[in-house]
UniProtKB/Swiss-Prot annotation:
This is Chaperone protein DnaJ. GO terms for molecular function: ATP binding; heat shock protein binding; unfolded protein binding; zinc ion binding. The keyword Disulfide bond does not apply. The keyword Protein biosynthesis does not apply. Binds 2 Zn(2+) ions per monomer. Homodimer. Pfam families: DnaJ, DnaJ_C, DnaJ_CXXCXGXG. Zn(2+) 1 binds at residues 155, 158, 208, 211. The gene is dnaJ. A zinc finger (CR-type) spans 142-220. Belongs to the DnaJ family.
Length: 375
């Protein structure tokens, strides 16, 4: 073993973080692993050297002792560093490097001791997501929708066992029903998915023809779901137990319905408020009056227009907006007024407007289309 310092061996600074130390060791372990460098004594020594350094620097107490006293401070309590009989939890280092383990151990499924394929025994089914387009009216008032979803359900022919009628699955002889096997080679001791049963813990000699041994078949089911008043785009509604059936008799997952509110031709939604534009005549803007305004529930609301109303003026109709989801009360409806200017006037209307202008002291009536003059 060389006399190089542990930080130098891993190629990191003395102030390196735990993640930096782990990453540096991972690269060296992959590069110099004996199974990838068979017969290369130098690579084997570098692998041992890197592992010894990592064993010390990964442990806060050992690292502190090393920083204060060097290797002597570590060896005094550890009995002399890393040897062939020492064991390191490589799954902690390589968590997502199942493909590398497959190369070292000749296949058999990815993952370290925390990974692996599907375990034996009952498992919860997968959750499902369904995107539902909802009209603004339904979002405001609430409505029951009927949706159709594809999902995996327990096979009715084999009742989920995966075996044909008259037969049953048997315990996998390779993993004894655990779904995983432990393999040791060189310095590694790794748990991987059992290649024979693919992690199920059982083997099926005569698979069910309907589900081909999976125990699940795809079905289309109609689900009734109540859309509550007040939902908005992105609201997620949970329907418990309406996801996919669980393998090996496990519980079903859940269904999540995500609402998307469609654009409305009249109303604009802002939170729980509604915005609507309403046009009025010039005479009503000047003299005032009363107009009918549509509401989201299909009814009409009488709105009084005061004298001198300007274009762009906003009137609030309190409590005529969208209900608050899961709470009490509603938002408001805001009416934006647009004053329409007549483009054509009758002779009588023109005379009245000219008289109005004279009373106001305005000079009007140049007539005709506008002209541009350039000097």
């Amino acid at each position: 073993m060389s006399d190089r310092g542990y930080y130098e061996v891993l190629g990191v600074s003395k102030g390196a973080s735990d993640d930096e130390i782990k990453s540096a060791y991972r690269k060296l372990a992959i590069k110099y692993h004996p199974d990838k460098n068979k017969g290369d004594k130098e690579a084997e020594e570098k692998f041992k050297e890197a592992t010894e350094a990592y064993e010390v620097l990964r442990d806060p107490q050992k690292r502190q002792a090393y920083d204060q006293f060097g290797k002597a401070g570590v060896n005094a309590g550890a009995g002399g560093g890393y040897g062939a009989g020492a064991y390191t939890d490589f799954s902690d280092i390589f968590g997502d490097f199942g493909d590398i383990f497959s190369e070292f151990f000749g296949g058999g499924g990815g993952g370290g001791s925390r990974g692996g394929g599907r375990r034996s025994g009952p498992q919860r089914g997968s959750d499902l997501r369904y995107n539902l387009e909802v009209s603004l009216e339904d979002a405001a008032l609430g409505k029951e929708y009927k949706i159709e979803i594809p999902r995996l359900e327990t096979c009715v022919d084999c009742t989920g066992s995966g075996a044909s009628k008259g037969s049953s699955p048997t315990v996998c002889p390779d993993c004894s029903g655990t779904g995983q096997v432990r393999r040791t080679q060189g310095f590694f001791s790794v748990t991987t998915t059992c290649p024979r049963c693919k992690g199920k813990g059982k083997v099926i000699s005569n698979p069910c023809k309907t589900c081909k041994g999976e125990g699940l078949t795809e079905k289309r089911r109609t689900i009734h779901i109540k859309i509550p008043a007040g939902v908005e785009s992105g609201s997620r509604l949970k329907v418990s137990g309406e996801g996919e059936s669980g393998p090996n008799g496990g519980p079903s997952g859940d269904l999540y319905v995500v609402t998307h509110i469609k654009k409305h031709p009249v109303f604009e939604r802002q939170g729980n408020d509604l915005i609507v534009q309403k046009s009025i005549s010039l005479s009503m803007a000047c003299l005032g009056g009363e107009i009918e305004v549509p509401s989201i529930d299909g009814k009409t609301i009488q709105l009084k227009i005061p004298e001198g109303t300007e274009s762009g003026q906003i009137f609030r109709l309190k409590g005529h907006g969208i209900p608050y989801l899961g709470s009490y009360g509603k938002g408001d409806q805001h009416v934006i007024i647009k004053v329409e200017i007549p483009k054509k006037l009758s002779k009588k209307q023109k005379e009245l407007m000219e008289e109005f202008a004279r009373e106001s002291g305005e000079k009007v009536g140049s007539g005709g289309k506008s002209k541009l003059f350039f000097r």
